[in-house]
């Protein structure tokens, strides 16, 4: 009998293939496994987005196949208070937040972790995230997933070593095709289900339509940053993010040349969207950033200069940088090379090789 047989693991079952295979792998490792389906959003009956019922049915089918119990819990109130309201506040302020990071911080590794431990008597929780846990000197580290294309450590940088110590990430050691293959061999209901895309509470709905239901759009001018020439009208600053080139409606401007136009700045006070031509326009480039609301996985604040790499958005190549503490829970990050489309409100996440050190929210970008 495995040493794990006395250990109870609650797997966050999303109705997707990754959490399905995670439950199976933990069973194979000898753990006592149960599933938990979290409902984090109350849908409106009049929308087409009703995937929660399908996801729950898929999670139940997988649990039935594996012979494990599935619990359900409703965290919609916690989600609204701790994730969604902050998401709206950030958009109102002209920034671009990442609600998936907030959801992991407030729901999956806080509300879920507490519920699993206190109500279900769990020793661990597990999720289908593509990350790895590595314990060194009694502290748990967060490592990138083995599959570089699927690594999700960027979304989990707010976790502390204590939270990681209570979490298992079985698919983090695998590549995505291996996960699909296991699901197909087991004939799991989720084997061929496509990966979910988009923000969890919006699903496949059009983002602008969704946002307009909660924040009134305020149309305003689009100006060329080089000469203040009017280029058109935007429907609301909240619909645009730095570096965006699609959906501006200003293609083919007279005497405009061939290069595409990009969003390079937002003047929230005056409701102006600034654009420039070319993906290497100086106003699009940043030499660094200032970050706040810092989270370090080892819980040790930075006290000296640090050489490492940083990601300023998911699925982006690492940028070599120097991080300097400013005190007051802020840091300056200087890139070795200028980098495009650094976006306030998004997260900057730091790495030493495969180890995720932590990160913070981008407060401003440095343009010199």
Swiss-Prot record:
EC number: 2.8.1.13
Cystine connections: 103-200
Span list, region Interaction with tRNA: 150-152, 313-314
Signal peptide boundaries: none
UniProt-annotated stretches for the region Interaction with target base in tRNA: 98-100
Its biological purpose: Catalyzes the 2-thiolation of uridine at the wobble position (U34) of tRNA(Lys), tRNA(Glu) and tRNA(Gln), leading to the formation of s(2)U34, the first step of tRNA-mnm(5)s(2)U34 synthesis. Sulfur is provided by IscS, via a sulfur-relay system. Binds ATP and its substrate tRNAs.
The name this protein goes by in its record: tRNA-specific 2-thiouridylase MnmA
Organism classification: Bacteria, Pseudomonadati, Pseudomonadota, Gammaproteobacteria, Enterobacterales
């Amino acid at each position: 009998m495995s040493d794990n047989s006395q250990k109870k693991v609650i797997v966050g079952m999303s109705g997707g293939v990754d959490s399905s295979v995670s439950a199976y792998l933990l069973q194979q490792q000898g753990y006592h496994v149960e599933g938990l389906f979290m409902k984090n959003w109350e849908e409106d009956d009049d929308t087409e987005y009703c995937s929660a019922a399908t996801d729950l049915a898929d999670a139940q089918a997988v649990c039935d196949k594996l012979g494990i119990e599935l619990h359900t819990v409703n965290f919609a109130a916690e989600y609204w208070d701790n994730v969604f309201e902050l998401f709206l506040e950030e958009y109102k302020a002209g920034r671009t937040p990442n609600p998936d990071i907030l959801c992991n911080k407030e729901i999956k590794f806080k509300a879920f972790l507490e519920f699993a431990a206190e109500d279900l008597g769990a020793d661990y929780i597990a999720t289908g995230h593509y990350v790895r846990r590595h314990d060194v000197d009694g502290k748990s580290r967060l490592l990138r997933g083995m599959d570089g294309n699927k690594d999700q450590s960027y979304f989990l940088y707010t976790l502390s070593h204590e939270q990681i110590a209570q979490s298992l990430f079985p698919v983090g050691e695998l590549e995505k095709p291996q996960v699909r293959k296991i699901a197909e061999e087991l004939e799991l209901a989720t084997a061929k289900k496509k990966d979910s895309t988009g923000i969890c509470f919006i699903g496949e709905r059009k983002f602008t339509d969704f946002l307009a239901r909660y924040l009134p759009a305020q149309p305003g001018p689009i100006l060329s940053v080089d000469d203040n020439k009017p280029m058109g009208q935007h429907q609301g600053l909240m619909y645009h993010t730095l570096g965006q080139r699609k959906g501006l409606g200003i293609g083919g401007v007279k005497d405009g040349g061939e290069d595409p136009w990009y969003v390079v700045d937002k003047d929230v006070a005056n409701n102006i969207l600034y654009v420039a031509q070319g993906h290497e326009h100086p106003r699009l480039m940043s030499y660094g950033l200032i970050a706040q609301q810092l989270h370090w996985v080892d819980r040790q604040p930075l006290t000296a200069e640090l050489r490492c790499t940083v990601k300023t958005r998911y699925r982006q190549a690492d940028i070599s940088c120097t991080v300097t503490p400013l005190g007051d829970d802020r840091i300056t990050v200087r890139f070795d090379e200028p980098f495009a489309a650094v976006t306030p409100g998004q997260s900057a996440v730091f790495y030493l090789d495969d180890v995720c050190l932590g990160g913070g929210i981008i407060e401003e970008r440095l343009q010199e």
